[in-house]
Amino acid sequence: MRVLRSPAKVNLGLWVTGKRADGYHDIVTVFHTVDFHDRIFIKRSHSLKIKTSSPLIPEGEENIVYKALKRFEEWTGVSPEVEVFIEKNIPAGAGLGGGSSNAAVVLKEVNSMYGEILSEKELSELASTIGADVPFFLKGGLAVAEGIGDKLRFLDKKIEREIFIIYPAVHVSTKEIYSKVTPDILTKKEDLHIIDSLLDDFEYFLENIENTLGEIALESYPQMREVYNTLEYLGYKPFVSGSGSSIFAFGKPEAEIEKICQVKGWKLIKTVLR
């Protein structure tokens, strides 16, 4: 049996640049994996089985990992006979990419088990048919993503910083947030000079990043707004990951934040960018 780490990610900014003919939106965002993860146990079996530790995550055909492995079978003609157990730590609907990460990690492992039947490029192409974030998690680290999030430019440098993430126990529908995007809040791609400062001046980058979807989510979900305002009041600069619902900040959380999270029932995650 193999035990794999399936990391979460945060978005360091997210700009919506347009709406496509197929109904999806083009974005520019910066992904970075963090040292907070699900654990995945995988072994060979006589059939494909997917189980999870969370009653909130579907098993079997409705699970994103199951769908990914069935797509693998379609592409390769190889039926992956494996048993997968996902020990969930990353909350669902939190903007942390848990499901996409699970799919990518298992796809990569199964491809390895069957002798690298797909090249790195082919595996990434397959992953993009599962979900926009899935190709990123095949490698992780730091990347600038464009298109629907599937056009990736990985950066060699990693930004090792302590961060903490607060999940306010509310599931955000990304589809709902995208439906509220209006033309007046779109960003022209040519105006995104801030991306150039990502490696040269990270502090400047942090001071000036925006999150179009995050701003909509803050107006739509009072629980998120409460977390955001609490962090601002305590002197932190808060950021929304993806379309929410997680809010994160750099540094270590004060004892007061830990107490507030306990009282409010918010999940506090202390981790680092990695």
Curated annotation (Swiss-Prot):
Keywords attached to this entry: ATP-binding, Isoprene biosynthesis, Kinase, Nucleotide-binding, Transferase
NCBIfam families to which the protein is assigned, alphabetical: ispE (TIGR00154), PRK14611.1 (NF011205)
Cystine bridges: none
Pathway: Isoprenoid biosynthesis; isopentenyl diphosphate biosynthesis via DXP pathway; isopentenyl diphosphate from 1-deoxy-D-xylulose 5-phosphate: step 3/6
Catalyzed reactions: 4-CDP-2-C-methyl-D-erythritol + ATP = 4-CDP-2-C-methyl-D-erythritol 2-phosphate + ADP + H(+)
Segments forming a coiled coil: none
Domain of life according to the entry: Bacteria
BP-aspect Gene Ontology terms: isopentenyl diphosphate biosynthetic process, methylerythritol 4-phosphate pathway; terpenoid biosynthetic process
Active-site feature positions: K9, D133
Name this protein carries in UniProt: 4-diphosphocytidyl-2-C-methyl-D-erythritol kinase
Organism of derivation: Persephonella marina (strain DSM 14350 / EX-H1)
Sequence positions that bind ATP: P91, A92, G93, A94, G95, L96, G97, G98, G99, S100, S101
The family this protein is said to belong to: Belongs to the GHMP kinase family. IspE subfamily.
Enzyme's top EC category: transferase
Its biological purpose: Catalyzes the phosphorylation of the position 2 hydroxy group of 4-diphosphocytidyl-2C-methyl-D-erythritol.
Pfam families: GHMP_kinases_C, GHMP_kinases_N
Enzyme Commission numbers on file: 2.7.1.148
An example molecular function term from Gene Ontology annotations: 4-(cytidine 5'-diphospho)-2-C-methyl-D-erythritol kinase activity
PANTHER family on file: 4-DIPHOSPHOCYTIDYL-2-C-METHYL-D-ERYTHRITOL KINASE, CHLOROPLASTIC (PTHR43527:SF2)
